[in-house]
Amino acid sequence: MTNEYIPFLSKIKEIVKHTETEYTFRMTYVGEVRPGQFFEVSIPKYGEAPISVSGIGEDYVDLTIRKVGKVTGEIFELNEGSCFFMRGPYGNGFEKENYQGKELIVVAGGTGVSPVRGVISYFGEHPDEVKKLHTILGFKSPSD
């Protein structure tokens, strides 16, 4: 069993640049994780920041990060193949079974879309599992 309080080194598999200040980092990760959970990411000498999981794969997690401070600024300087520390996952996350057969309304904005992206994606791909899926998303500007 892994101790979620002990940081581990994770490698950047891929970087997707959405805007000048928002990137998605595909990080190596093997373990249980649910949409809505988050990791504490850290760069030694700069600190740590909580970042929500925006995507989950068999051997990775996606972290969509907005460049807003020292830690995220340093992460944005890294390249594919570079590493940073993570610990977690934390939070309860979203269990799809809680929403199956129901009308689902998802409201989110900005980088707050990241934690619910997995729920939207899953039920968007499996529409027969919910009565109806509504999404209301807000952003500062069209470029966001």
Predicted ranges, named:
Residues 70-144:
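FNR/FR-type flavoprotein reductase catalytic core
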